[in-house]
Amino acid sequence: MHPFSRLFRNIQSLGEEEVQELLGPPEDALPLLAGEDLNHRVADALNLHLPTADLQWVHKTNAITGLYSNQAAQFNPHWIQPEFPELHLHNDLIQKLQQYFGPLTINEKRKLQLNFPARFFPKATKYFPLIKGIKNNYPNFALEHFFATANYLWTLWEAGILYLRKNQTTLTFKGKPYSWEHRQLVQHNGQQHKSHLQSRQNSSMVACSGHLLHNHLSSESVSVSTRNLSNNISDKSQKSTRTGLCSYKQIQTDRLEHLARISCGSKITIGQQGSSPKTLYKSISSNFRNQTWAYNSSRNSGHTTWFSSASNSNKSRSREKAYSSNSTSKRYSPPLNYEKSDFSSPGVRRRITRLDNNGTPTQCLWRSFYNTKPCGSYCIHHIVSSLDDWGPCTVTGDVTIKSPRTPRRITGGVFLVDKNPNNSSESRLVVDFSQFSRGHTRVHWPKFAVPNLQTLANLLSTNLQWLSLDVSAAFYHIPISPAAVPHLLVGSPGLERFNTCLSSSTHNRNNSQLQTMHNLCTRHVYSSLLLLFKTYGRKLHLLAHPFIMGFRKLPMGVGLSPFLLAQFTSALASMVRRNFPHCVVFAYMDDLVLGARTSEHLTAIYSHICSVFLDLGIHLNVNKTKWWGNHLHFMGYVITSSGVLPQDKHVKKISRYLRSVPVNQPLDYKICERLTGILNYVAPFTLCGYAALMPLYHAITSRTAFIFSSLYKSWLLSLYEELWPVVRQRGVVCTVFADATPTGWGIATTYQLLSGTFAFPLPIATAELIAACLARCWTGARLLGTDNSVVLSGKLTSFPWLLACVANWILRGTSFCYVPSALNPADLPSRGLLPVLRPLPRLRLRPQTSRISLWAASPPVSPRRPVRVAWSSPVQNCEPWIPP
């Protein structure tokens, strides 16, 4: 049935004779449909012209929202956070894969090396303050969302997915270290690594000098202060500048000599080392920055608990005695991570209590409330004092490694949303790394093959038994190099910065946090903390502290992640295909599809793949494993041997949305955008395709309103109620060729020549399209040869609207192949000339696969015939499945 038959008969401006002519033979009707006058008359009848600006736009329909009507995100206080298994790929993944699947191809090795480890080094990175770590997307549930997001981040850290920043050069995490992390290892399971101990022994002189400076600051008997030290050095530098007798290296040597002289009871001097000051400078000055860093980090690297102030002072006194007694030993060096010492200098103490490793006040908010009097009936003091032991302020992982300089900042904010539109009971973490997709920090992501609708039909439209697998937390399987951590930082500002009035307390030199912390004591915060304590218990104290974390596994908010995941899963699918040539294995992102000729054979393959993947460290989500039979549900489509159709839920959704569209009201372009995005998904299955939505496209590009008429709305409903499958392309030889000129057309086949003229001149692209439609109508060929690139592309939205809709209906399921004009046998008949007698060019269609293959050209694998397979199976006779 003609797609415009009912529509043309309902248009009063078209007479009966004109309607019969438009619905008549294609050689007469198609040139008329390309006429500009007819398209304007139909557009006026359907009210498809853009409305005037004085009309008031509609910004919301029953199901779709437009401009100025953003839907507020819904927060679920009872969100269930997912539990992540121990996601750790095998350390020798490539060697392990070769044991299972034989020698790998070059492409498979290249894809695996891209992911093991993944590398992300943008040219520029913007850093944001920690106050922007958790986005306030739910103003009515700000505190609940704050603690839920912090708990989600700590859950990821406990699963080994995140690094925890200890200081600017040290990271800690839980789990097993990878081989590239072994090179940066500092501590593993509470024991110092050998390489780290060796480097500390080599720099014992530098660390000892840093300890001497520490003792010098805390000793009252030493008359020389650090200010005098800097003045002496500056005086020497000024004198050397005036006289020109002292160089910069001599200034550094004098500084080291002065550090050695101010030692309390130390016997290490330059003269006793048996070397000249120049030699001493060469051995020590290279580590002078490390010495300064060791001194600074030793002041700020302590991890305290809210109740351990007395024990810390006792430990620090005993530790100071140990340092003074061992100061004469050459091999001794103080540890880098120790508890805060009780410095006698008030200036040093004030600097130490201001900032911790993450750049936040080290004064624990929990301890502050515990030590102060309650300010009222809703003071947080009542909650804090209910427990004697709230646990540590922070934790340390099993492994500590060195890292590049990691600032006290973040590169992206985080927030929680529903796991998917159909599951609002579970939460999902969203990481906003959008800075790498815009502005001067934009990164051009690599492209990879994505299967379109025709590719899926060509690859998977077969009569096989199907099974779909889902990789659990697929992105978090792929590790990232520790050098990329400074670019992928997330964190929490802590409860002390939760209130906006406390945001400036870290910049206040008087450290007025204790004076302003009671601004948190409100009835809402108090009641929310009581409910949160019922949920998290003692962990509430840990979640209230600030922290900075970096991704150890691949995050989902970076454009590089889909590319790397696609490479990883496609390499796995290629290896499985080589070892099971009798089955179909297809992977797209985290979805893996298996196909076999019998269900028993499919079960055997599934059990083997599950055991292999589990041994490699790849976790499959058993709950999402689905057996489809002969009807595969994949990427929202139903794929069978007869073709591809959309799932019923998408068809019902489109029908509901179209029926809810109001008639004769100007809808803003944002509503048109969202409605067109929904209709586009099913448009390839309709008779007119994307061309039916051209009036909506015109309104969107013009950024103006669009008015749905009752005729246009009913016509769209009739189109989307009748869907046709997208069938698989066949590899056939082209035997029909078409060509056209502005005044005529020509068709050549193996046994006849056809030609004709147009009643009026047409654009060359329009004439070529009409010639292709005539060739399809008169010969029924599903493969046509043409020399016009516009027709070859298959995109008909640039033609007149009526012609584009009818041409899409006629050419549905038709493929094209390019033939040069000099070799096109229909070229001369289109010009009204007799053709040259010569054989037709032999052109064969290759079905479109979008650079996606279902087989792997690789070294041959030795055939294996399992004896345990007793049923009739292709494995016994080694009959391979040949893809289309």
Curated annotation (Swiss-Prot):
Keywords: DNA replication, DNA-binding, DNA-directed DNA polymerase, Endonuclease, Host-virus interaction, Hydrolase, Inhibition of host innate immune response by virus, Inhibition of host RLR pathway by virus, Magnesium, Metal-binding, Multifunctional enzyme, Nuclease, Nucleotidyltransferase, RNA-directed DNA polymerase, Transferase, Viral immunoevasion
Regulation: Activated by host HSP70 and HSP40 in vitro to be able to bind the epsilon loop of the pgRNA. Because deletion of the RNase H region renders the protein partly chaperone-independent, the chaperones may be needed indirectly to relieve occlusion of the RNA-binding site by this domain. Inhibited by several reverse-transcriptase inhibitors: Lamivudine, Adefovir and Entecavir.
Chain segments carrying region Spacer: 185-387
Region (Disordered): 299-345
GO biological process, one term: symbiont-mediated suppression of host innate immune response
EC number: 2.7.7.7, 2.7.7.49, 3.1.26.4
Region (Terminal protein domain (TP)): 1-184
Segments forming domain Reverse transcriptase: 398-639
PROSITE patterns assigned to the protein according to its UniProt record, in alphabetical order: RT_POL
PANTHER family, A to Z: REVERSE TRANSCRIPTASE DOMAIN-CONTAINING PROTEIN (PTHR33050), RIBONUCLEASE H (PTHR33050:SF7)
Recorded domain comment: Terminal protein domain (TP) is hepadnavirus-specific. Spacer domain is highly variable and separates the TP and RT domains. Polymerase/reverse-transcriptase domain (RT) and ribonuclease H domain (RH) are similar to retrovirus reverse transcriptase/RNase H.
Additional comment: Hepadnaviral virions contain probably just one P protein molecule per particle.
Reported function: Multifunctional enzyme that converts the viral RNA genome into dsDNA in viral cytoplasmic capsids. This enzyme displays a DNA polymerase activity that can copy either DNA or RNA templates, and a ribonuclease H (RNase H) activity that cleaves the RNA strand of RNA-DNA heteroduplexes in a partially processive 3'- to 5'-endonucleasic mode. Neo-synthesized pregenomic RNA (pgRNA) are encapsidated together with the P protein, and reverse-transcribed inside the nucleocapsid.
Listed name of the protein: Protein P
Organism: Woodchuck hepatitis B virus (isolate 7) (WHV)
